[in-house]
Design a protein with these regions (language model features):
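Detector for C-terminal structural segments
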Residues: 8, 14-16, 20, 27-29, ...
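N-terminal lobe/hinge region of extracytoplasmic solute-binding protein
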Residues: 36-129, 159, 234
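Ligand/substrate-recognition segments at binding pockets and active sites
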Residues: 56, 246, 286, 299, ...
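Gly/Pro-rich hinge or "lid" segments in bacterial periplasmic/extracellular proteins
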Residues: 96-114, 159, 203-276, 281-285, ...
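Aromatic-rich, solvent-exposed beta-strand/loop patch
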Residues: 118-125, 144, 149, 189-210, ...
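Surface-exposed binding/hinge segments that line
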Residues: 136, 170-218, 237-245, 389-405
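Ligand-site clamp/hinge motif
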Residues: 138, 227, 258-310, 352, ...
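Extracellular/periplasmic solute-recognition and catalytic clefts
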Residues: 177-180, 242-253, 278-342, 349-353, ...
Length: 627
């Protein structure tokens, strides 16, 4: 999967049942016993060629002579109370800075869609049927306390992450055995052959230091990897936590004598001596902090702010640069997600009625300055998005999983209702009323009631002011149908707790999608994940056809089949109206103080911040000292 799957998955936690691995008491066998003559590879690619040869020195898109030094200050919205990655999404709120502390077995190339090269691992081997994979660790890979990274660390990481993290438990559910098969070699055996993606996703395993987690803290207490912690963790990565203020800030410093400084996948990257993460409760305060030069860059998610809030003197004086970076590495679905565990939303007609009530076109004009487009796919922005009617391979796949394909799935393309003018809005309202009546609801005294005469009521659960603006625009349309609508804004901790326990009617959800989807689809839409606390199956989907299509994606033997199966899944999800699709932009918006530089950015790297940039002293001197 491109876009680093970890980045997508760590946006939330999800789970499915999986057998636990036991790293204790493993028998060490010889490599010859594990595989008579393994073919060792320096890279993995799901589909397509590998660009860089085994002896490559660096990625083409980095500046190998980038100066090291300087400070980079960035903004995070929300708070944190945890540095333990193993319980992210289950307990506490993880600090985003933790991602720069640890490393994975492989590292993604940002100028290829689906290719990984060795990081902690120097080479990898797997058979043609992808039934197992062996990773060979670099002999010079070290933790930042000087101890070597070992197979025992890798086994401990797999076991711990599967045990304590719903995200990893589901993600690695097909890994049924992990064993040390040589001084530097770890073999992972899978539950079935044919899953091309499994060697790659094992390569994305975050490796944790066993000796540190099994040791004691500064007060003599045994560490617990199953609990949250604010003890500064040991990593193998280019940065370490220097200091922090709980919930407010984290400062990282570049590790002196970092083992991987000259590794091909690291040269020209991680150039800042210090990186500071400042946490703000909301975007209004964070923008003011940026304007006051208390942060070096800000990612702007608000169309209104992008259109109206960046006219302060530093912009007109060109001391602050506004840039948009294309999002080529992923697709997305963002929408109002129904909790179909609730009786009201178990009926597809009700869900569809809510979609008819959403006037995106008017919202786009009034709130977003016409910047957005409506999302029409769960894989929006990629070749994986369904369109038209299913043909050829996609049709055949739908026939295989359905038997008799429902007419609506094949008769016409999925289309969202279009509003924007009074006549269209009135027609959409009539359609909503018709669907609700078919579902057994009727209007009495301007209230939509069920068969017992109880008014239909829904609560939108949100955790940010920008989300509140959107819901408040949508709210009157639902109220005109006779629905009682409550908007509940809570803090991040409450929001996460209610998500984990499925205590909501409707939430805004975002599912990031890679260019090569696979096992994570089970966690997004699969039956096994539907009722497990912490699942990313926010909707609660339990659909045998969806499960079959996910398997078609996972076990696709070629790119053509994967694309066709993904389009089929997209089509089925759309026609079940599990969400009210919202909107997308296709670019990331950044404002930054002009004290940094970068080489030409790779196609799949977005902004490249912070890893590909460096502090430019000449530019910094021109715009003056920081506040």
């Amino acid at each position: 999967m491109n876009i680093s799957r970890r980045r997508l998955l760590q946006s939330g936690a999800f789970v499915a049942a999986a057998p636990a691995l036991n790293a204790a008491g493993l028998n060490v066998v010889t490599l010859a016993q594990a595989q008579a003559a393994p073919e060792w590879r320096h890279a993995l690619s799901l589909f397509g060629d590998i660009k860089y040869p085994a002896d490559f020195k660096r990625f083409d898109y980095v500046n190998p002579d980038a100066p090291k030094g300087g400070i980079a200050r960035q903004i995070s919205i929300g708070t944190f109370d945890n540095f333990n990655l193993a319980v992210a999404g289950v307990k506490g709120t993880i600090a985003p800075a933790v991602g720069l502390i640890y490393e994975t077995l492989m590292a993604r190339s940002q100028d290829e869609a689906t290719t990984q090269y060795g990081l902690l691992a120097e080479s990898v081997s797997h058979p043609d049927d992808h039934s197992w994979v062996i990773y060979r660790l670099r002999k010079d890979a070290k933790w930042n306390d000087g101890k070597p990274v070992t197979p025992e660390d890798v086994l401990f990481s797999m076991e711990s992450l599967k045990k304590y993290s719903p995200m990893y438990s589901s993600y690695y559910k097909h890994v049924v055995k992990a064993e040390k098969v040589g001084p530097h070699d770890i073999k992972f055996t899978f539950d079935a052959p044919g899953n091309r993606e499994l060697p790659t996703i094992v390569g994305e395993l975050t490796v944790l230091p066993k000796h540190w987690w099994e040791g004691k803290d500064s007060e003599g207490r045994k560490r617990d990897i199953g609990a949250t912690t604010l003890e500064k963790p040991l990593g193998s990565g280019p940065y370490a936590i220097r200091d922090f203020v709980a919930g407010r800030s984290v400062t990282l410093e570049r590790v002196k004598n970092y083992w991987g400084a000259n590794a091909p996948t690291r040269i020209g990257q991680n150039n800042f001596d210090e990186m500071r993460f400042e946490f703000f409760r909301d975007t209004t305060v964070s923008l003011e902090a940026f304007k006051a030069d208390q942060a070096d860059w800000i990612i702007e998610s608000s169309a209104k702010s992008w259109a109206t809030a960046y006219d302060f003197p530093a912009v007109t004086e060109k001391r602050v640069v506004l840039e948009e970076f294309p999002i080529n590495d992923s697709g997305r679905m963002q929408g109002f997600a129904f909790n179909i565990r609730r009786e009201l939303f178990a009926d597809k007609r009700v869900r569809r009625a809510f979609n008819y009530a959403f006037d995106f076109e008017e919202m786009n004009k009034q709130l977003f300055y016409g910047q957005y487009k409506r999302i029409n796919s769960y894989f929006e922005g990629t070749e994986l998005a369904s369109s038209g009617v299913p043909v050829q391979r996609e049709f055949d796949i739908l026939k295989e999983v359905y038997g008799d394909i429902p007419p609506e799935v094949i008769a016409k393309p999925y289309e969202n209702p279009v509003g924007g003018d009074p006549e269209k809005v009135r027609e959409n309202r009539r359609q909503s009323t018709r669907l609700l009546k078919e579902a057994g609801y009727e209007v009495r005294d301007q209230k939509l009631v069920d068969k017992n005469g109880k008014q239909v009521s829904v609560e939108f659960l949100i955790d940010s002011p920008p989300s509140e603006r959107i819901v408040l625009f949508y709210k009157p349309s639902l109220e005109r149908l006779g629905i009682e609508v409550t908007v509940r804004t809570v803090d991040t901790a409450q929001y996460q707790n209610r998500l984990r326990s499925f205590d909501y009617d409707i939430v805004t959800e975002v599912w990031g999608q890679s260019l090569s989807p696979g096992n994570e689809q089970r966690d997004f839409w699969g039956t096994e994940a539907a009722d497990v606390p912490g699942s990313r199956n926010t909707v609660g989907i339990k659909n045998p056809v969806v499960d079959k299509l996910i398997d078609k994606i996972i076990f696709a033997k070629d790119r053509e089949t994967l694309v066709a199966a993904t389009k089929a899944l997209d089509r089925v999800l759309l026609w079940h109206y599990y969400v009210v699709p919202q909107f997308t932009y296709g670019f990331s918006r950044y404002a930054r103080w002009d004290r940094f530089s970068h080489a030409p950015l790779p196609k799949y790297g977005r902004s490249g911040l912070p890893s590909l940039w460096w502090y430019d002293k000449e530019k910094a001197d021109k715009i003056g000292k920081r506040s």
